[in-house]
C-alpha cells in the first residue's frame, strides 16, 4: 500500500530512529529523488519534531548540515522531509570490524570539530555528540561528514547580545552516558566545552574499539550510570589514551580545562590533529578505511586531488553561506523544555499505514536478514549509485542506525 506525505513524497520503509520519532526512506513522486522522512505522532506527550525542524532551519547553509525539504502535518503525524544521507559513523565502525586507522580518525576529527564549531556559532550546543549522530553523505558528497539529530540541542547564548546562559548545578540532564562529559555526569549545566569533550571520547572509541566504561553491569539504569561516571572519573586521560599519539590526551585535557562559558579554540584543536596528520605522512585524499576495505585498489591521483579541492571549496562556500544567512526567528529559550524525560523516542500511537494518506494496493515484500545486510553493505560504496528506484521503495529495508544499547537516554544527577 503506497503511503504519501504532503501529496509530494512517497513513504518507504523505516531506516532508523532519532531522539524523538522514527525515520523512513522516501522519494519525491515527481522526480524520484530519495529523501529521509522523520515522523512523530501528534498525540505524543512531548512533541519535539517542530522544534527540531526549527533548529535545522536555523542551521541551513552550513557545510555538513542536511537540507530540509518540507515540514508540516500529515494526518496524525508531524513530518519533516530532509536530505537522504549515507551510513552513520557507527554503521561504518561496525563495517570496519570496530577499529579505525589513525588516518581515518584524524580525517574524521577535522570535520567533526568543524561541525560542532558551526553549531556553536549559531548559538546552540548539540548535547548528544556520538557516532550515530554523524553520517556520511552520498554520491559526490560521499566524503563529507554530516551532523544530525537536534532533538536535544539547546540555546546557550543570546543571538544578539551573546549573553551566555548561567552556570547551574543539580541539573537533570540528557545525553548518551558512554560519551557524556564528566561535568554532565556531575549534573552541571552543559556548554560548548561538553560537546567537545564528548567528541574526544568518540575519537578514543574509534581508536580503541571500545571505552573502559562500556559493558558495566548494574541492577538499574541509575546504578549503571553511576558506575559509568565513577569509571570515567577514575580513568586518567593518559591511561585512556595510552599507546596513542599524545595529541589525543592533549585534546581531552584542553577540553576539561575550559571554564563553563569559555569559547573553545577550535582552530587550535583542528591544527593539533592536522600537524599529527602531516607528521605521520598521511595524504588528504579522503580515502577512509571503509573505502579501502570495500575497494582496495588505489584511486587515480588526479581524482584524489580533485576531490580534495572540491571538499575545500565546499567548506569555504559553506562558511560564506553561513555568515551571510539572514537570522531566522530564535528557537525556544534555554531550558524551555523543562525537566521532562527528553531523550527517549516516543512510541507511536499507531503505524503510519493507518494515519497517512493511502493510495494504491501494493503490499511490502518480505526481505531476509541476509538481503538487508547486503543492502546496508552496498550503501558503503563511496560514489556508487546508492539509490534504488522509486518503485522499489516499499521493498527496501534498512538496518536501524541506532542500536538499542546506544540510544540516548535521560539520566538523573548522579550526585543525589
UniProtKB/Swiss-Prot annotation:
Keyword Metal-binding: no
EC number: 2.7.11.1
One Gene Ontology molecular-function label: protein kinase activity
Biased composition, class Polar residues, residue ranges: 350-365, 400-409
Matches recorded under SUPFAM superfamilies: Protein kinase-like (PK-like)
InterPro entries per the UniProt record, alphabetical: CK1_Ser-Thr_kinase, Kinase-like_dom_sf, Prot_kinase_dom, Protein_kinase_ATP_BS, Ser/Thr_kinase_AS
Domain Protein kinase: 9-277
Pfam families per record: Pkinase
Top enzyme class: transferase
Lineage: superkingdom: Eukaryota
GO BP annotations listed: endocytosis; positive regulation of canonical Wnt signaling pathway; positive regulation of proteasomal ubiquitin-dependent protein catabolic process; protein phosphorylation; rhythmic process; signal transduction
Keyword set, alphabetical order: ATP-binding, Biological rhythms, Cytoplasm, Kinase, Nucleotide-binding, Serine/threonine-protein kinase, Transferase
Low complexity bias spans: 324-338
Binding annotation for ATP: 15-23, 38
The reaction(s) this protein catalyses: L-seryl-[protein] + ATP = O-phospho-L-seryl-[protein] + ADP + H(+); L-threonyl-[protein] + ATP = O-phospho-L-threonyl-[protein] + ADP + H(+)
Subcellular location: Cytoplasm
Cellular component terms (Gene Ontology): cytoplasm; nucleus
SMART domains (UniProt xref): S_TKc
Active site: 128
Chain positions covered by the region annotation Disordered: 301-416
Start-end of Basic and acidic residues biased regions: 301-318
Job of this protein: Casein kinases are operationally defined by their preferential utilization of acidic proteins such as caseins as substrates. Can phosphorylate a large number of proteins. Participates in Wnt signaling. Phosphorylates DVL1. Central component of the circadian clock. May act as a negative regulator of circadian rhythmicity by phosphorylating PER1 and PER2. Retains PER1 in the cytoplasm.
Family: Belongs to the protein kinase superfamily. CK1 Ser/Thr protein kinase family. Casein kinase I subfamily.
Subunit structure of this chain's protein: Monomer. Component of the circadian core oscillator, which includes the CRY proteins, CLOCK, or NPAS2, BMAL1 or BMAL2, CSNK1E, and the PER proteins.
Protein's UniProt name: Casein kinase I isoform epsilon
Encoding gene (name): CSNK1E
Amino acid at each position: 500500500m503506497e503511503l504519501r506525505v504532503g501529496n509530494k513524497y512517497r513513504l518507504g520503509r523505516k531506516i532508523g530512529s532519532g531522539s524523538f520519532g522514527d525515520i523512513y526512506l522516501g522519494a519525491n513522486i515527481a522526480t524520484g529523488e530519495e529523501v529521509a522522512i522523520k515522523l512523530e505522532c501528534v498525540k505524543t506527550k512531548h512533541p519535539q519534531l517542530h522544534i527540531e525542524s526549527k533548529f535545522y532551519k536555523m542551521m541551513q547553509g552550513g557545510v555538513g548540515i542536511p537540507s530540509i525539504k518540507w515540514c508540516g502535518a500529515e494526518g496524525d503525524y508531524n513530518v519533516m522531509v530532509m536530505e537522504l544521507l549515507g551510513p552513520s559513523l557507527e554503521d561504518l565502525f561496525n563495517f570496519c570490524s570496530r577499529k579505525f586507522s589513525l588516518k581515518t580518525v584524524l580525517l574524521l576529527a577535522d570535520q567533526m570539530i568543524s561541525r560542532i564549531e558551526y553549531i556553536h556559532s549559531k548559538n546552540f550546543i548539540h548535547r548528544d555528540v556520538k557516532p550515530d549522530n554523524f553520517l556520511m553523505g552520498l554520491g559526490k558528497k560521499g566524503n563529507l561528514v554530516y551532523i544530525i539529530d537536534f532533538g536535544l540541542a539547546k540555546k546557550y547564548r543570546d543571538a544578539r547580545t551573546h549573553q551566555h546562559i548561567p552556570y547551574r548545578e543539580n541539573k537533570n540532564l540528557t545525553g548518551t552516558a558512554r560519551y557524556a562529559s564528566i561535568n554532565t555526569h556531575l549534573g552541571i549545566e552543559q556548554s560548548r566545552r561538553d560537546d567537545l569533550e564528548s567528541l574526544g571520547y568518540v575519537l578514543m572509541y574509534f581508536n580503541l574499539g571500545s571505552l573502559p566504561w562500556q559493558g558495566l553491569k548494574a541492577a538499574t539504569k541509575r546504578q549503571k550510570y553511576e558506575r559509568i561516571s565513577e569509571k570515567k572519573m577514575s580513568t586518567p586521560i593518559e591511561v585512556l589514551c595510552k599507546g596513542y599519539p599524545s595529541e589525543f590526551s592533549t585534546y581531552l585535557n584542553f577540553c576539561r580545562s575550559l571554564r563553563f562559558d569559555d569559547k573553545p579554540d577550535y582552530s587550535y584543536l583542528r591544527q593539533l590533529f592536522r600537524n599529527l596528520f602531516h607528521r605521520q605522512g598521511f595524504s588528504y585524499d579522503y580515502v577512509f578505511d571503509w573505502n579501502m576495505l570495500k575497494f582496495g585498489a588505489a584511486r587515480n591521483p588526479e581524482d584524489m586531488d580533485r576531490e580534495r579541492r572540491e571538499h575545500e571549496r565546499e567548506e569555504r562556500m559553506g562558511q560564506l553561506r553561513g555568515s551571510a544567512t539572514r537570522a531566522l526567528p530564535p528557537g525556544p529559550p534555554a531550558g524551555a523544555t523543562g525537566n521532562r524525560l527528553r531523550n527517549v523516542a516516543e512510541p507511536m500511537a499507531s503505524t503510519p499505514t493507518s494515519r497517512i494518506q493511502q493510495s494504491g494496493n501494493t503490499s511490502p515484500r518480505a526481505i531476509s536478514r541476509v538481503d538487508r545486510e547486503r543492502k546496508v553493505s552496498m550503501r558503503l560504496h563511496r560514489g556508487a549509485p546508492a539509490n534504488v528506484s522509486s518503485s522499489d521503495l516499499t521493498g527496501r529495508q534498512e538496518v536501524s542506525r541506532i542500536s538499542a544499547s546506544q540510544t540516548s537516554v535521560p539520566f538523573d544527577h548522579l550526585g543525589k
